UniProtKB/Swiss-Prot annotation:
Name of the molecule in the record: Uracil-DNA glycosylase
NCBIfam families: PRK05254.1-1, PRK05254.1-2, PRK05254.1-4, PRK05254.1-5, ung
Species per Swiss-Prot/TrEMBL record: Staphylococcus epidermidis (strain ATCC 12228 / FDA PCI 1200)
This protein's record includes keyword Hydrolase: yes
PANTHER family documented for this protein: URACIL-DNA GLYCOSYLASE
Record GO cellular component, one term: cytoplasm
Entry EC no(s): 3.2.2.27
Job of this protein: Excises uracil residues from the DNA which can arise as a result of misincorporation of dUMP residues by DNA polymerase or due to deamination of cytosine.
Length: 216
Protein backbone atom coordinates (compact mmCIF):
# COMPACT_ATOMS: atom_id res chain seq x y z
CA UNK A 1 0.00 0.00 0.00
CA UNK A 2 1.29 3.44 -0.98
CA UNK A 3 -0.06 6.94 -0.40
CA UNK A 4 -1.26 7.12 -4.00
CA UNK A 5 -3.50 4.11 -3.37
CA UNK A 6 -4.71 5.51 -0.04
CA UNK A 7 -5.54 8.87 -1.64
CA UNK A 8 -7.31 7.18 -4.55
CA UNK A 9 -9.44 5.14 -2.15
CA UNK A 10 -10.36 8.22 -0.10
CA UNK A 11 -11.22 10.40 -3.07
CA UNK A 12 -13.40 7.73 -4.66
CA UNK A 13 -15.52 7.63 -1.49
CA UNK A 14 -15.61 11.36 -0.69
CA UNK A 15 -16.12 14.44 -2.84
CA UNK A 16 -13.57 17.14 -2.01
CA UNK A 17 -14.46 19.47 -4.91
CA UNK A 18 -16.01 22.09 -2.61
CA UNK A 19 -12.87 22.11 -0.45
CA UNK A 20 -10.68 22.33 -3.53
CA UNK A 21 -12.67 25.30 -4.85
CA UNK A 22 -12.56 27.03 -1.46
CA UNK A 23 -8.79 26.60 -1.21
CA UNK A 24 -8.22 27.87 -4.74
CA UNK A 25 -10.08 31.05 -3.82
CA UNK A 26 -8.32 31.36 -0.44
CA UNK A 27 -4.84 31.01 -1.92
CA UNK A 28 -5.75 33.59 -4.56
CA UNK A 29 -7.32 36.20 -2.26
CA UNK A 30 -5.76 35.60 1.18
CA UNK A 31 -2.43 34.71 2.75
CA UNK A 32 -2.68 31.02 3.59
CA UNK A 33 -0.20 28.67 5.27
CA UNK A 34 1.61 26.54 4.43
CA UNK A 35 2.63 27.44 0.88
CA UNK A 36 0.50 25.45 -1.54
CA UNK A 37 3.39 23.19 -2.57
CA UNK A 38 3.91 22.16 1.08
CA UNK A 39 0.35 21.20 2.02
CA UNK A 40 1.10 17.48 1.64
CA UNK A 41 4.72 17.51 2.75
CA UNK A 42 4.07 15.09 5.62
CA UNK A 43 3.13 12.46 3.03
CA UNK A 44 6.01 13.34 0.73
CA UNK A 45 8.61 12.85 3.48
CA UNK A 46 7.08 9.81 5.19
CA UNK A 47 6.13 7.03 2.75
CA UNK A 48 3.11 5.01 3.84
CA UNK A 49 5.12 1.79 4.01
CA UNK A 50 7.68 3.42 6.34
CA UNK A 51 5.30 4.75 9.02
CA UNK A 52 6.31 3.79 12.55
CA UNK A 53 4.77 6.67 14.49
CA UNK A 54 1.93 9.14 13.99
CA UNK A 55 2.00 12.41 15.94
CA UNK A 56 -1.28 14.28 15.57
CA UNK A 57 -1.50 18.05 15.58
CA UNK A 58 -4.48 20.34 14.98
CA UNK A 59 -4.03 23.03 12.33
CA UNK A 60 -0.86 24.67 10.99
CA UNK A 61 0.90 27.59 12.63
CA UNK A 62 -0.70 30.78 11.34
CA UNK A 63 2.30 33.12 11.52
CA UNK A 64 4.74 33.92 8.70
CA UNK A 65 7.72 31.64 7.98
CA UNK A 66 6.45 28.88 10.27
CA UNK A 67 4.21 26.20 8.78
CA UNK A 68 5.68 23.99 6.08
CA UNK A 69 3.41 20.94 6.13
CA UNK A 70 4.66 19.00 9.17
CA UNK A 71 2.72 19.14 12.44
CA UNK A 72 4.58 21.00 15.24
CA UNK A 73 7.57 21.71 12.98
CA UNK A 74 8.60 25.16 11.75
CA UNK A 75 11.04 26.28 9.10
CA UNK A 76 14.72 26.10 10.09
CA UNK A 77 15.28 29.76 11.00
CA UNK A 78 11.87 30.45 12.52
CA UNK A 79 11.30 31.31 16.15
CA UNK A 80 10.61 28.29 18.37
CA UNK A 81 6.88 27.84 19.06
CA UNK A 82 6.18 27.25 22.78
CA UNK A 83 4.68 23.78 22.23
CA UNK A 84 7.73 22.62 20.30
CA UNK A 85 10.03 24.01 22.98
CA UNK A 86 8.15 21.94 25.55
CA UNK A 87 8.36 18.87 23.32
CA UNK A 88 12.13 19.31 23.22
CA UNK A 89 12.32 19.81 26.98
CA UNK A 90 10.48 16.52 27.50
CA UNK A 91 12.76 14.88 24.92
CA UNK A 92 15.82 15.99 26.86
CA UNK A 93 14.32 14.84 30.16
CA UNK A 94 13.16 11.55 28.66
CA UNK A 95 16.14 10.32 26.63
CA UNK A 96 18.78 12.97 27.22
CA UNK A 97 19.13 14.48 23.78
CA UNK A 98 19.21 18.19 23.04
CA UNK A 99 17.77 19.50 19.78
CA UNK A 100 18.57 22.96 18.47
CA UNK A 101 16.61 23.14 15.20
CA UNK A 102 12.83 23.68 15.19
CA UNK A 103 12.65 21.77 11.90
CA UNK A 104 11.40 18.18 12.21
CA UNK A 105 12.16 16.93 8.71
CA UNK A 106 14.54 14.31 10.13
CA UNK A 107 11.73 12.84 12.25
CA UNK A 108 9.53 12.63 9.14
CA UNK A 109 12.29 10.76 7.29
CA UNK A 110 12.57 8.37 10.27
CA UNK A 111 8.99 7.23 9.74
CA UNK A 112 7.21 9.72 12.00
CA UNK A 113 4.07 11.00 10.25
CA UNK A 114 3.61 14.54 11.57
CA UNK A 115 -0.05 14.95 10.71
CA UNK A 116 -2.25 17.94 11.40
CA UNK A 117 -5.98 17.17 11.33
CA UNK A 118 -6.49 20.36 9.27
CA UNK A 119 -3.80 21.02 6.67
CA UNK A 120 -4.24 24.73 5.89
CA UNK A 121 -4.98 27.97 7.74
CA UNK A 122 -5.46 31.65 6.94
CA UNK A 123 -2.72 33.97 8.24
CA UNK A 124 -3.42 35.14 11.78
CA UNK A 125 -6.70 33.22 12.04
CA UNK A 126 -6.35 29.97 13.98
CA UNK A 127 -8.86 27.27 13.00
CA UNK A 128 -10.04 29.33 10.01
CA UNK A 129 -10.05 26.26 7.74
CA UNK A 130 -11.86 23.93 10.08
CA UNK A 131 -14.93 22.15 8.71
CA UNK A 132 -14.12 22.65 5.04
CA UNK A 133 -13.33 18.95 4.51
CA UNK A 134 -9.85 18.40 5.92
CA UNK A 135 -11.13 16.51 8.97
CA UNK A 136 -12.83 13.94 6.74
CA UNK A 137 -9.62 13.50 4.77
CA UNK A 138 -7.32 13.13 7.78
CA UNK A 139 -9.74 10.86 9.65
CA UNK A 140 -9.51 8.56 6.64
CA UNK A 141 -5.71 8.81 6.72
CA UNK A 142 -5.65 7.73 10.37
CA UNK A 143 -8.05 4.88 9.59
CA UNK A 144 -5.89 3.72 6.67
CA UNK A 145 -2.72 3.69 8.77
CA UNK A 146 -4.56 1.69 11.42
CA UNK A 147 -5.98 -0.76 8.89
CA UNK A 148 -2.98 -1.38 6.66
CA UNK A 149 0.06 -0.92 8.90
CA UNK A 150 1.19 -3.03 11.86
CA UNK A 151 2.53 -1.92 15.24
CA UNK A 152 2.39 1.84 14.78
CA UNK A 153 2.63 4.20 17.75
CA UNK A 154 -0.05 6.90 17.71
CA UNK A 155 0.86 9.86 19.92
CA UNK A 156 -2.26 11.81 20.83
CA UNK A 157 -1.59 15.01 22.77
CA UNK A 158 -4.63 16.87 24.03
CA UNK A 159 -8.35 16.26 23.76
CA UNK A 160 -8.85 17.03 20.04
CA UNK A 161 -6.18 14.48 19.08
CA UNK A 162 -7.55 11.94 21.54
CA UNK A 163 -10.96 12.13 19.89
CA UNK A 164 -9.32 10.34 16.95
CA UNK A 165 -8.68 7.23 19.05
CA UNK A 166 -11.88 5.72 17.68
CA UNK A 167 -10.21 5.27 14.29
CA UNK A 168 -7.30 3.23 15.69
CA UNK A 169 -7.25 -0.53 16.25
CA UNK A 170 -5.70 -0.82 19.71
CA UNK A 171 -5.25 -4.58 19.32
CA UNK A 172 -2.34 -4.03 16.92
CA UNK A 173 -1.13 -0.50 17.63
CA UNK A 174 0.04 1.47 20.66
CA UNK A 175 -1.67 4.72 21.66
CA UNK A 176 0.21 7.19 23.87
CA UNK A 177 -2.01 9.86 25.40
CA UNK A 178 -1.18 12.88 27.52
CA UNK A 179 -2.09 16.55 27.81
CA UNK A 180 -0.93 18.81 24.98
CA UNK A 181 2.63 20.25 25.16
CA UNK A 182 1.31 23.82 24.97
CA UNK A 183 2.21 26.07 27.93
CA UNK A 184 -1.44 25.93 29.01
CA UNK A 185 -1.37 22.20 29.69
CA UNK A 186 2.21 20.90 29.63
CA UNK A 187 2.48 20.90 33.42
CA UNK A 188 -0.74 18.91 33.77
CA UNK A 189 0.85 15.66 32.66
CA UNK A 190 2.76 16.20 29.43
CA UNK A 191 6.04 16.70 31.26
CA UNK A 192 7.12 13.34 32.62
CA UNK A 193 5.00 11.33 30.19
CA UNK A 194 8.09 9.92 28.41
CA UNK A 195 6.54 9.51 24.95
CA UNK A 196 9.85 9.14 23.12
CA UNK A 197 11.31 6.30 25.17
CA UNK A 198 7.91 4.60 25.39
CA UNK A 199 7.66 4.71 21.60
CA UNK A 200 11.10 3.24 21.06
CA UNK A 201 10.64 0.52 23.66
CA UNK A 202 7.45 -0.56 21.90
CA UNK A 203 9.04 -0.50 18.44
CA UNK A 204 11.99 -2.58 19.65
CA UNK A 205 9.61 -5.06 21.28
CA UNK A 206 8.00 -5.54 17.85
CA UNK A 207 11.31 -6.00 16.05
CA UNK A 208 11.33 -2.52 14.52
CA UNK A 209 14.19 -0.03 14.40
CA UNK A 210 13.66 2.69 17.02
CA UNK A 211 13.26 6.33 16.00
CA UNK A 212 16.38 8.48 16.09
CA UNK A 213 14.79 11.42 17.93
CA UNK A 214 18.08 13.26 18.42
CA UNK A 215 19.68 15.41 15.75
CA UNK A 216 22.26 13.42 13.83
Amino acid sequence: MKWSEVFHDITTRHDFQAMHDFLEKEYTTQTVYPDKQNIYQAFDLTPFEDIKVVILGQDPYHGPNQAHGLAFSVQPHAKFPPSLRNMYQELENDIGCHRTSPHLQDWAREGVLLLNTVLTVRQGEAHSHRNIGWETFTDEIIQAVSNYREHVVFILWGRPAQQKERFIDTSKHLIIKSPHPSPLSAFRGFFGSKPYSTTNNYLKSKGKTPVQWCES
